[in-house]
């Protein structure tokens, strides 16, 4: 990742050098907190939006696009000014529906870093209908601004007029809000507990079928993923995708996976088979399934 980032941001530029130094200090995680953003903006006389635009090729470098070879980068800006990178993640030899779109990637990245509200989405290509619908699940969706290289400060709902969303199904819960499904993590195996805790934070008001993923890497690091459901159903993002996306955006290698656990309360639906199918194309490590 280090060399790819350096190729994306030519190092004969002082701003690019400063950005690379920040990323190096955090092991190439695709994230800049508010203080880092403010310092870069101050040192190089930029607005946060101009900095985000400059960072889009960098965000896109986290893509995995074995099918389309079309890299999309996105930056979700949290309400306190943190920058969460996102990139499209494709999976060859699996169903195309397993794909993670760049805006989904940035939002789920923010979610797993415990962001509670997105104020702006900066992206290098116009959001597709799938992503517009996914963003409409967010709290305050009507106030989110979309920024493109050729057009800034566009309300999300200008891309999604007469929008369908949670309120149409009498759902008050929104993606990124605090969630609690009363799932108890009291197993002797800590990785199973981490998967249960992730499931407990799932956003699944339509199926009430939470599930979570916990991945253990050979160096002892853990990554978790939560299920993000959508009022339109199909734009929903399974927990395996949110976990893999977080791993990619934090420079984890799938070849270093040691164990993967899914914890699921399968009331109306189950993601077990879908997860097993995707995993079989990525690793020889088998999914450990824990029913809640």
Swiss-Prot record:
Reactions listed under catalytic activity: cytidine + H2O + H(+) = uridine + NH4(+); 2'-deoxycytidine + H2O + H(+) = 2'-deoxyuridine + NH4(+)
Disulfide bonds: none
UniProt keyword Membrane present: no
UniProt cross-references to InterPro entries, sorted A to Z: APOBEC/CMP_deaminase_Zn-bd, CMP_dCMP_dom, Cyd/dCyd_deaminase_Zn-bd, Cyt/Deoxycyt_deaminase, Cyt_deam_dimer, Cytidine_deaminase-like, Cytidine_deaminase_bacteria
Catalytic-site annotation from UniProt: 103 (proton donor)
EC number: 3.5.4.5
GO molecular function, one term: cytidine deaminase activity
Free-text comment on the cofactor: Binds 1 zinc ion.
Annotated Zn(2+) binding sites: 101, 128, 131
UniProt family annotation: Belongs to the cytidine and deoxycytidylate deaminase family.
Task of the protein: This enzyme scavenges exogenous and endogenous cytidine and 2'-deoxycytidine for UMP synthesis.
Name assigned to this protein: Cytidine deaminase
Organism, as annotated: Haemophilus influenzae (strain PittEE)
């Amino acid at each position: 990742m280090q060399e790819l980032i350096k190729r994306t941001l030519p190092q004969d530029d002082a701003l690019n050098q400063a950005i690379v130094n920040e990323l190096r200090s955090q092991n190439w995680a695709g994230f800049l907190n508010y203080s880092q953003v403010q310092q870069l903006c101050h040192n190089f006389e930029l607005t946060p939006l101009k900095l985000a635009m400059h960072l889009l090729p960098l965000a896109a470098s986290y893509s995995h696009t074995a099918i389309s070879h079309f890299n999309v980068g996105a930056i979700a800006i949290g309400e306190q000014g943190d920058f969460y990178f996102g990139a499209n993640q494709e999976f060859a030899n699996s169903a195309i529906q397993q794909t993670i779109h760049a805006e989904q990637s940035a939002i789920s990245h923010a979610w797993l870093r415990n962001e509670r509200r997105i104020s702006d989405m900066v992206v290098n290509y116009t959001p597709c209908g799938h992503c517009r619908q996914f963003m409409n699940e967010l709290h305050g969706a009507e106030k989110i601004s979309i920024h493109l290289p050729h057009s800034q400060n566009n309300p999300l709902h200008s891309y999604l007029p007469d929008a369908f969303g949670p309120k149409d199904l009498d759902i008050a819960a929104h993606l990124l809000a605090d969630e609690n499904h009363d799932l108890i993590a009291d197993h002797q195996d800590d990785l199973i507990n981490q998967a249960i805790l992730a499931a407990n934070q799932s956003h699944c008001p339509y199926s009430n079928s939470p599930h979570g993923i916990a991945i253990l890497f050979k160096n002892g690091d853990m990554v978790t993923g939560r299920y993000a459901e959508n009022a339109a159903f199909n734009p929903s993002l399974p927990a395996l995708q949110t976990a893999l996306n977080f791993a990619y955006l934090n420079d984890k290698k799938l070849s270093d996976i040691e164990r993967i656990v899914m914890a699921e309360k399968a009331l109306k639906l189950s993601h077990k088979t879908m997860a097993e199918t995707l995993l079989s194309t990525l690793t020889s490590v088998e999914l450990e399934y824990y029913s809640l």
